[in-house]
From Swiss-Prot:
The keyword Ribonucleoprotein applies. Its main location: nucleus. Residues 36-45, 164-175 have a biased composition (Basic and acidic residues). Residues 1-175 are annotated as: Disordered. Residues 1-12 have a biased composition (Gly residues). This is U3 small nucleolar RNA-associated protein 25. Belongs to the UTP25 family. DEAD-box RNA helicase-like protein required for pre-18S rRNA processing, specifically at sites A0, A1, and A2. GO terms for biological process: maturation of SSU-rRNA from tricistronic rRNA transcript (SSU-rRNA, 5.8S rRNA, LSU-rRNA). The keyword Ribonucleoprotein applies. Component of the ribosomal small subunit (SSU) processome composed of at least 40 protein subunits and snoRNA U3.
């Protein structure tokens, strides 16, 4: 396995899919002083006076982020006992006194103190002012406004046909026990089906005789929604489109879903449906608690009535999102579906999340604009609280119903393992997780996503005012992870997403993977060229990087070095940054390629560096250009002068293959730098690249290319 990246540095870039770094826009600096430069380029004109021509980027040390203020308890609790309920009660008997919240305490003390303040206090105040996501303190009687009102919205009473009741509120104990036992033993059964032209792989606990594949739904009328949401859904969403018809029965049935066909075109439809489901879950949970409060109040203190309707903490839904703009879209959909009378802190929210400046023209691809338009900041977190008539933004996490965050933002809120100030109790009762644009999160630091999932649904260290007589039994049994629904929306599947589904999705309702039948990108390049796919042998995933490098240096490099003068215009595309460093070092130090001039553009290259490399590549001073996938993801450079492309590895995103293999070579033909039909593409792949390969060559071809005895495949 690739390394997990640096332990304490949140923006670290490790191996492929394990320690991806931050957004890659700009150049970071080392906390140990200036970065030492690596000679990662070679110019054709050796007496060139520009020293910058021989410079190349080196991976900078990670930027250390500032401390984030939270309500974390600093005590280092012991590990959980094998008997979760008893261990939980024992941990709370040690210290049941509520902890004083930091900002409230400081505010009260300040009233009786002189006006003078220390430098540290001023620094803390300045830090809080800079933190635009700082949560506001709620009054102690935070739920006082939630008075019982007589209304006709009583359709959420116990309903055996409502998935909310059958999955969360009143599940069948025997059925759940059998399925949870099967899940804990890793006993799963699989069924395959076709849903609206999407291939569905349904996995369910093997204790079942068989799990039916839900049929597509035509519209919101078939859903068990709160009456108010049913009315707004009919107006705001209407009849379902094809994407919603396939997605809705899986989503509202509380199955885990890995949806691998999220596109720019259907993204809004999927977002609306997901937000509707999240709101429905929050409203049903909240109203059930309020009505039970009323029942208990009528019965009095001596009642034996047992109403278990809660978790340990209030937050029920978590959205993991790549940028502030993606958060803005989700929040606006929730607001439109909710139609609140009041929105508390809405102006502050818009100041922090709305960026009306148009940054990109139509020359940028649609998927690029969809991701990076608006505020593309990947450091944020937001709590949202609902009352009957109000939405409150920036509520404290422990008083929130829905949490929105980037992986980095939530990781910072949880805290650092090094200083033992971790606070993740607010994740203990999350019942629905939505990971939107997961393919974009893969280009950030995926380790943060893994860290968050590792800390979901753990039993809390502190009581946080919890009434344990109201906590559902399956929380006390430490089964919360078996009830949580996880929804992952991605443009495509990757090994990281499949592993996330395997390791962290233990839903007793089962899980479903949806993905399309891929026609392939080979015939969609818009230019005639020779495409050669060469398969190399690799004995395991761990040894794949070494086998790939060995094949590249023994089978690809010799022909490149032999015809060094004819190598002008060779672009080498490298998906992994670790592989990029290895290849760059080889070109810089190996005698086998000492006659080959080269340049490099990675995600760490700043604008001047990248501009020099592009210019030298265009005029031939760099005959070879090394180019990473993340650099292309964040910049989408329009490289000119490309005459042949070597894919050291295939990109995850099939759009990148079209843009690089088709777009760059087509541009060279238009610029009359390349004779029509003379461009070439060479791809290096192994059997472990099957997911990437399928999207490029098509679902029908991929099996033969992986399994046939021959190892070379040509397409013209």
């Amino acid at each position: 396995m690739a390394p997990r990246g640096r332990g304490g540095n949140f923006r670290g870039r490790g191996g492929r899919g394990r320690g991806r770094g931050g957004r890659g826009r700009g150049r970071a600096t080392s906390r140990f002083g200036p970065n030492r430069r690596f000679d990662g380029a070679r110019l054709a004109d050796n007496d060139e006076s520009e020293s910058s021509g021989s410079e190349a980027e080196s991976a900078p040390e990670d930027e250390v982020m500032g401390d984030v203020d939270s309500d974390a308890d600093d005590d280092d609790e012991d590990e959980q006992s094998s008997k979760p309920y008893m261990a939980l009660l024992q941990s709370f008997t040690e210290n049941n006194a509520p902890k004083a919240k930091r900002r409230k305490l400081e505010h009260q003390e300040a009233q009786g103190q002189p006006e003078e303040s220390s430098d540290d206090e001023k620094a803390d105040e300045e830090e809080e002012e800079k933190d635009i996501d700082r949560a506001e303190e709620d009054p102690e009687d935070q739920d006082a406004e939630e008075q019982i009102e007589d209304d006709d919205d009583s359709e959420d009473e116990d309903n055996l046909t409502d998935p909310f009741d059958t999955h969360f509120a009143h599940p069948d104990d025997d059925t759940v026990a059998k399925r949870v036992k099967a899940v804990q033993k890793g006993e799963w059964a699989t069924k395959r089906a076709l849903i609206q032209n999407l291939r569905a792989t349904v996995t369910y606990p093997s204790s079942d005789a068989g799990s039916e594949v839900p049929k597509p739904m035509a519209g919101p009328d078939g859903l068990s929604l709160k009456q108010k949401l049913k009315e707004t859904a009919a107006r705001k969403i209407g009849e379902f489109d094809a994407a919603q018809r396939a997605f809705s029965p899986l989503l509202f049935n509380y199955s885990d879903v890995l949806h691998c066909d999220r596109t720019v075109r259907n993204s809004d439809s999927l977002r609306k449906l997901t937000c509707l489901h999240a709101l429905n879950h929050v409203f049903k949970t909240r109203d059930r608690v309020i009505k039970n409060n009323y029942k208990l109040a009528k019965e009095g203190q001596d009642t034996e009535l047992e109403l278990r309707d809660q978790g340990f903490t209030r937050p029920k839904v978590l959205f993991l999102l790549p940028t502030r703009n993606s958060c803005l879209r989700i929040v606006n959909i929730i607001r439109d579906l909710c139609e609140p009378d009041q929105q508390e802190n809405r102006k502050r929210f818009e100041e922090g999340y709305v960026d009306k400046e148009a940054k990109f023209g139509d020359d940028r691809p649609a998927d690029f604009r969809d991701l990076f338009e608006g505020s593309d900041d990947d450091m944020f977190r937001l709590g949202m609280k609902f009352t009957r008539k109000t939405i409150k933004y920036f509520s404290q996490f422990y008083n929130s119903d829905i949490l929105f965050a980037s992986p980095l933002g939530l990781r910072m809120a949880i805290g650092s393992e090094e200083d033992k100030k971790l606070d993740f109790d607010f994740l203990s009762s999350i019942e629905m997780v939505v990971v939107d644009q997961a393919d974009a999160l893969l280009m950030q630091n995926w380790e943060h996503v893994e860290f968050i999932f590792e800390h979901l649904n753990l039993q809390p260290k502190d009581a946080h005012g919890c009434d344990f007589s109201r906590v559902r039994n399956w929380y006390l049994e430490d089964w919360a992870k078996h009830f949580r629904q996880t929804v992952i929306l991605s443009a495509f599947n990757t090994p990281e997403l499949s592993e996330l589904l395997r390791l962290h999705c233990h839903n007793w309702a089962g899980k479903v993977r949806l993905q399309p039948e891929y026609p392939g990108s080979l015939s969609q390049l818009g230019v005639k060229l020779k495409q050669t796919f060469s398969r190399f042998r690799s004995s395991s995933v761990d040894k794949d990087p070494d086998a790939r490098f060995e094949y590249f240096t023994s089978a690809i490099v010799p022909s490149l070095a032999k015809r060094a003068k004819d190598a002008t215009g060779t672009l080498i595309f490298i998906p992994s940054y670790l592989d990029f460093v290895r290849v760059r070092n080889y070109f810089a130090t190996s005698s086998a390629v000492e006659n080959v001039t080269f340049g490099a553009i990675s995600e760490y290259a700043d604008v001047p560096e990248a501009s020099r490399a592009r210019s030298h590549f265009l005029n031939g001073r760099h005959r070879v250009l090394l180019y990473t996938e993340r650099a292309h993801h964040f910049r989408r450079y329009q490289l000119r002068g490309v005459q042949r492309v070597i894919f050291y590895g295939l990109p995850d995103n099939p759009i990148f293959y079209n843009e690089i293999a088709g777009g760059y070579l087509s541009k060279s033909e238009q610029d009359m730098r390349l004779e029509p039909g003379q461009g070439s593409v060479k791809v290096v792949f192994s059997k472990y690249d099957v997911m990437k390969l399928e999207r490029i060559v098509g679902s029908k071809r991929v099996g033969k290319m992986i399994q046939e005895r021959g190892d070379t495949f040509e397409f013209i």
